A protein has these predicted regions:
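GHKL/Bergerat-fold ATPase module
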Residues: 184-185
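Extended, charge-biased low-complexity segments
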Residues: 1-167, 189-196, 200-225
Length: 225
């Protein structure tokens, strides 16, 4: 995620299973993994006491994520381990505790309806092909005003941010729009220090943005079923 708000964590990210230096890339199998394939009971890496090696040391983590069998809370914990800025990590740890009591991925019911309708329509295949595209659309559909302004500039494979006019948007919408653009283009208009400041980004908005980060990292499988 070079150039995104998480650029400061790039070196650390390369040490996590499934991430390699960007110059080398990652070889991904075309095989579509299922939950049965990733059942930890059949893992050859379990200890003699049949204990799982855990997310951090799991050699099958990329496959488990692709199969959609890594829980939302587990993805958040992995995300926290990558963060160098302590104030930011502390805020996300708070969100993790809240999510265990009140799990929610979308901003509200209207957001869920908009996004899922696009997903189910079959007219936007890049939702499943491009993590950057999916993360940006996820954010743009979260705000009624932003969606009204942007929907005509989103096609099957691209988003034309330069044509979207956001004059009149509120402060939350402003942060959502620029974070969506950052995740799509790999820019850093919204800094990680700003995301760490609760006076600029409230907890509910931060949760939405973090969920978009998870989509940017893992794709649509990050969205709980």
């Amino acid at each position: 995620m070079r150039g995104t708000p998480l650029a400061l964590t790039e070196i650390e990210m390369q040490l996590i299973p499934g991430f390699s230096p960007q110059s080398t890339g990652i070889m991904r199998s075309r095989y579509k993994y299922t939950g049965t394939d990733c059942d930890c009971r059949f893992c050859t890496q379990t200890t003699e006491k049949k204990k799982c090696c855990g997310s951090t040391g799991c050699v099958c983590l990329p496959e488990r994520i692709m199969a959609g069998c890594v829980p939302y809370e587990e993805l958040l914990r992995l995300f926290i381990k990558e963060i160098q800025l302590r104030t930011f990590a502390t805020r996300i740890e708070k969100l993790l505790k809240e999510s265990e009591a009140n799990p929610t991925f979308f901003r509200n019911a209207e957001h869920c309806r908009r996004f899922q309708n696009l997903r189910k329509s079959g007219l936007f295949p890049f939702l499943n092909l491009s993590e950057a595209y999916a993360a940006a659309v996820f954010l743009l559909t979260s705000d009624a005003f932003l969606w009204k302004q942007s929907k005509d500039f989103i096609n099957q494979s691209s988003i034309h941010f330069k044509d979207i006019r956001i004059h009149g948007v509120n402060l939350d919408g402003y942060a959502i729009f620029h974070t969506a653009r950052d995740l799509y283009y790999g820019t850093d208009y919204i800094a990680i220090s700003e995301l760490s400041d609760p006076e600029l980004i409230n907890d509910k908005l931060l949760r939405l943005i973090i969920n978009a980060f998870l989509i940017r990292r893992h794709g649509m499988v990050a969205i709980p079923a």
